[in-house]
A protein has these predicted regions:
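Mobile active-site "lid"/loop adjacent to the S-adenosyl-L-methionine
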Residues: 131-159, 163, 167
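Conserved S-adenosyl-L-methionine
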Residues: 18-127, 132-134, 150, 154
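Generic signal for short, ordered secondary-structure residues
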Residues: 8, 68, 138-139
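Long recognition/docking surfaces used for binding and targeting
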Residues: 1-10
Length: 168
């Protein structure tokens, strides 16, 4: 109950300029994508894990055997820059049955996008990139010149381009 009240508080109002996508929206988007067991999904600014949980709720309906359950547990990948939302995300995923969530406390924009390989790509990228922010000049160094920008949302779109599988 405490976790749910903290989550609702964060989702209903911006916290330090952050706004979280309402659960009804994350659920709707996951339903429209129609995830399948074996597909991988990423959210590179996952906040408290709303998109990750919505994806898992859709996948959970399809689990029919142990192999499906193992794929389910490895189907999501998240990164969150800020400590408090990251901790809430881990808690959220533990409460939804993931023993070892593949979610990391890191800054998505601080890795050179040209270093990503096919192994770093996902079938689906389901997220709400941070809008309205600007990044320091050194962050642009992680992107090719034609994609370098100080706009946070533009940089996340570039990351998405480099991390989505060819037919994703």
């Amino acid at each position: 109950e405490i976790y749910e009240s903290i989550l609702k508080e964060l989702q209903s109002a911006g916290s330090s300029g952050e706004f979280y996508t309402p659960r009804a929206v994350t659920d709707f988007m996951a339903q429209m994508i129609k995830p399948k067991i074996g597909e991988t999904m990423a959210d590179f600014a996952c906040g408290t894990g709303g998109f990750l949980v919505s994806w898992l709720k859709e996948l959970q309906k399809q689990i029919k055997c142990t192999a499906d359950a193992e794929k389910y547990g490895k189907s999501i990948y998240g990164i969150e820059k800020k400590q408090f939302p990251y901790m809430l995300c881990i808690t959220n995923l533990l409460l939804h049955g993931l023993d070892i969530p593949q979610v990391y406390h890191d800054n998505t924009l601080l890795k050179d996008v040209l270093d990503y390989t096919d192994d770093d790509r996902f079938d689906v990228i389901l997220m709400n990139p941070p809008y309205g922010g600007s990044e320091k000049a050194d962050v642009k160094n992680h992107f090719p010149n034609d994609l370098a920008s100080s706009e946070t949302a533009d940089l996340f779109m570039a990351v998405i381009m480099y991390r989505l599988k060819k037919n994703g």
